[in-house]
């Protein structure tokens, strides 16, 4: 991690953000603190030109409106064309049909290198992409959990199927909370979405999950007991 942060400070990349006005100041300050340089631009007439000058693109659905959608599409496609890193934060994606439709459209038209959301937001994306498994009861962590360091794109989404984690506005629904008991199922679902979209998926909460589809980091603010392996 130290090496990556030093690299960012050395390169000082310009990052294009089409984000929500609630957190725009925080996003800019975090980028500056990391050694990057932020620019906030959501005018459709200039986003392709702005993106071309940058080294990365951050799209955030927090304060979504009709004006931002074509701007996000154009910026995303330009970033893909130039090989820039593109990140999606699907804030409150389950709160309305408008947000779901926009997210589905973006996932079809833009290839994302990373998607970060709370558990309800990620479950909604999984539902849109047809990778959300129906709950078949508690799954033993010891039977399926593959938690290790990460070692190791096309029409991504199909029809809406599975369970839709709508959340509470922009917050995760309490019923969706990642716990020790359901951890293995959430890891499995996150990996499936990651493989489907060929992107890194990060789920944030009391227990964070970060997966590349093959392996998964589990970062916890609470104690998770060491899984026991069944006897051979």
Model-predicted regions and their roles:
Residues 19, 23, 211, 228:
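Ser/Thr-centric signal marking residues that sit
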Residues 222-232:
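Single conserved hydrophobic/aromatic residue that forms the stacking wall/gate
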Residues 98-216:
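Conserved phosphate/ATP/ADP-binding segment of small-molecule kinases
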Residues 71, 76-108, 112-114:
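Glycine/small-residue-rich loop that forms an oxyanion/phosphate-binding "nest" at active or ligand-binding sites
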Residues 219:
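Hydrophobic residues at beta-strand termini and immediately following loops
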Residues 62, 91-93, 120, 206:
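Active-site beta-loop-alpha junctions enriched in small/polar residues
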Residues 1-88:
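Conserved N-terminal subdomain of the carbohydrate kinase-like
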Residues 46-47, 94, 209:
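Positions that flank functional sites
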């Amino acid at each position: 991690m130290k090496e990556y942060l030093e690299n960012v400070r050395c390169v000082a990349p310009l990052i294009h953000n089409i984000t929500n006005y609630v957190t725009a100041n925080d996003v800019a300050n975090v980028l500056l603190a990391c050694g990057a340089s932020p620019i906030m631009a959501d005018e459709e007439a200039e986003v392709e030109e702005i993106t071309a000058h940058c080294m990365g693109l951050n799209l955030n659905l927090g304060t979504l409106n009709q004006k931002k959608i074509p701007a996000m599409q154009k910026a995303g496609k330009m970033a893909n064309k130039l090989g820039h890193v593109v990140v999606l934060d699907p804030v409150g994606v389950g709160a309305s049909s408008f947000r779901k439709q926009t997210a589905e459209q973006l996932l079809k038209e833009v290839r994302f290198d990373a998607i970060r959301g709370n558990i309800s937001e990620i479950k909604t994306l999984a539902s849109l992409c047809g990778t959300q498994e129906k709950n078949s009861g508690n799954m033993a962590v010891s039977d399926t959990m593959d938690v290790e360091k990460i070692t190791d794109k096309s029409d991504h989404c199909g029809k809406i199927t599975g369970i839709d984690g709508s959340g509470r506005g922009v917050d995760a629904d309490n019923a969706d909370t990642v716990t020790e008991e359901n951890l293995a199922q959430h890891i499995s679902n996150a990996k499936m979405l990651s493989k489907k979209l060929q992107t890194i998926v990060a789920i944030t909460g009391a227990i964070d999950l970060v997966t590349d589809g093959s392996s998964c980091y589990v970062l916890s603010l609470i104690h998770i007991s060491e899984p026991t392996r069944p006897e051979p």
